[in-house]
Amino acid sequence: MNRKEKTAIIQQLTESFKSHDCFYIVDSTKLSVQATNQFRRDCHQAGVTYKVAKNTLILKALDEVPHMASDVYTSLRDEVLKGFSGILFFNETASVPAKLVKEFRKQKNLDRPILKGAYIDGELFVGDENLEALSQLKSKQVLIGEIITLLQSPMANVLSALQSGKNQLSGIIKTLGDRSE
């Protein structure tokens, strides 16, 4: 690969890192060609972009990403980007790539691809042991909906108590009025 090709790959990766909220780095070595192609198809169907690149090119692309914290970059360099690295890019729900990897493993009865690391909203999750937790993450819209429901719940309880209190008060007054007659 010549310098021009490397520069083009770095630019593509940089744009992908800048334009996506999350990315997962996986190791899919020891997968057969058929399994690798199936994994790529599954990624495409789920709307996940899957790219394979050399670790040095990935690091150079990450150098160009302004929102990448230095401790995250260091962890990526020292712990995650070793050996084969495939990158899964996704924008919406951060759990989609994790669910995709989990489902692929289950369908093929394999232990690969292995999650090496995941970067989600400024946080880095290192290691395959995080796959289960990452697959259960809720989308931002779902979380916002749950928060709004929780915030509305006390208000609904107060209104209901006021309504029932009004009915009770009118019932007590009516009873006292009937009793005095």
UniProtKB/Swiss-Prot annotation:
<dbReference type="GO" id="GO:0070180">
    <property type="term" value="F:large ribosomal subunit rRNA binding"/>
</dbReference>
<dbReference type="GO" id="GO:0006412">
    <property type="term" value="P:translation"/>
</dbReference>
<dbReference type="InterPro" id="IPR043141">
    <property type="entry name" value="Ribosomal_uL10-like_sf"/>
</dbReference>
<keyword id="KW-0699">rRNA-binding</keyword>
<keyword id="KW-0689">Ribosomal protein</keyword>
<keyword id="KW-0687">Ribonucleoprotein</keyword>
<protein>
    <recommendedName>
        <fullName>Large ribosomal subunit protein uL10</fullName>
    </recommendedName>
</protein>
<dbReference type="InterPro" id="IPR047865">
    <property type="entry name" value="Ribosomal_uL10_bac_type"/>
</dbReference>
<dbReference type="GO" id="GO:1990904">
    <property type="term" value="C:ribonucleoprotein complex"/>
</dbReference>
<keyword id="KW-0694">RNA-binding</keyword>
<dbReference type="GO" id="GO:0005840">
    <property type="term" value="C:ribosome"/>
</dbReference>
<dbReference type="Pfam" id="PF00466">
    <property type="entry name" value="Ribosomal_L10"/>
</dbReference>
<comment type="subunit">
    <text>Part of the ribosomal stalk of the 50S ribosomal subunit. The N-terminus interacts with L11 and the large rRNA to form the base of the stalk. The C-terminus forms an elongated spine to which L12 dimers bind in a sequential fashion forming a multimeric L10(L12)X complex.</text>
</comment>
<comment type="similarity">
    <text>Belongs to the universal ribosomal protein uL10 family.</text>
</comment>
<dbReference type="InterPro" id="IPR022973">
    <property type="entry name" value="Ribosomal_uL10_bac"/>
</dbReference>
<dbReference type="InterPro" id="IPR001790">
    <property type="entry name" value="Ribosomal_uL10"/>
</dbReference>
<comment type="function">
    <text>Forms part of the ribosomal stalk, playing a central role in the interaction of the ribosome with GTP-bound translation factors.</text>
</comment>
